[in-house]
Amino acid sequence: MSASVRVWLIVALVALAAAGTAVGVTLATRTDVAKQTSKPPPYAADPTARPEIARAVQEALRAWPAGTVRRLRILAERYPQSGLVRLELGLALVLTGQQADATKAWLDAERVQPDSPSAVRAQDLRHPNTPPDLPPFVPSFSQPTSAVQARLLRGAAFQQELRPVSAEREFEAAAALAPANPEALTAAAVGLYDKDRPALAFSHLGPLVRRFPHAQTVRFHLGLLLIYFGDARRARRELALARSQGPRTPLGRRAYTLLKAGQKS
């Protein structure tokens, strides 16, 4: 991904309410990893971690540099289902020059606790040239008026909390309730996005363009996913089409924000 596309995405996500504060946390983590190894690895708080695990991890980080890796390895054995321990172990390993072991630790974080901020951040660290976090589903409404919309808002809230599995579950439930609803189907497709397998989300979202050619949500989210994928030219085209389908709607205004951010990058 080019530097200009990366800047575009970061600027744009700040303006998207669905992005929450997760972008800042992830960017800070990446920045600290690139700095001098005299500082301990950054602690990335994970609300899904049990309090005693969080405390033990922070104590291990305070032992930097002498005992941190050893303590985190012990914690990994003690807490085999903790993504936070494995995320921080990977950070400590990469700062001591053990890149291969760090990558394995991050893969383990994703495997043992996929529905956690630690798993999302671990995937980010394995893909340092991609945008932070996962593409958000942006609802076209703010207050739900149906069970389907309630599911969509819950899924978007889980995305803000960096809980991708829970978000995907809510989006799939919405699509099951309304199999002909373009917004529910779009959310389900967005929820499938994975940096190791981005084609899966596109394979579900692409056909919706043909099925719902006038659905603004489909065009908007296709453009958003294309930014994450790094295809700026096609992203601009889809976002422009989305805006043309309703420039004054919430999604139309967000499409304009993304397009303006692209001009500044």
Where are these regions (language model features)?
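Alpha-helical segment of the N-proximal tetratricopeptide repeat
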Residues: 46-79, 88, 146-173
